[in-house]
Amino acid sequence: CSGYSTGQTMYQVQKEYQEVLSQYSNVMIGKLPKPHSGSGTGASYRFGDGNAVLTMACLVINTAEYCSETVPQLGDMVREKIDDAFAEHVNFDAVEDCYYDAINVAVRVLSTGLEARLMTHLNSMAKMPWESWSDVGDQSPYVASIHQVCVDVIPQLRRLLSETYFRSFCDSFITTFLALCV
């Protein structure tokens, strides 16, 4: 039966795990689009008319959520197995924070991406010479186009995200969107 070191060697191995797990969160963030400046709410992300980036952001959120839940368990297992002299130095909190950072970036990609899709229609609507209109119809084409963007995006997000992160997306979107409208 082979044995393994529960001292310095195991401590070094867990440090390597921490480094690799932190790098993995950066790889996930790297799968997301880079921010564009110029939004009234700070950096914005665009996911265009296709849904590939939207889907990737949801996958990043789901993967980072899983990792953020399992990393503390890994830390607990290492602390159980490692020598007492090293146990108090085993801390995976920074790694867990990396995954929460990835989630936050992905949620921001989703909320500002939807905002960017809507802004095209809102900007067109704002440029209309409304004072020249004599009467108002039942529903403007702007309302229909804004509704269609929401119908195309929001149900897909609801299907792909857990309730917690769908709510986080909604909160983030409303915060940035209302700041533009008010």
Give residue ranges: language-model regions:
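Extended alpha-helical rod/solenoid/coiled-coil scaffold segments used as assembly/tethering elements
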Residues: 1-182
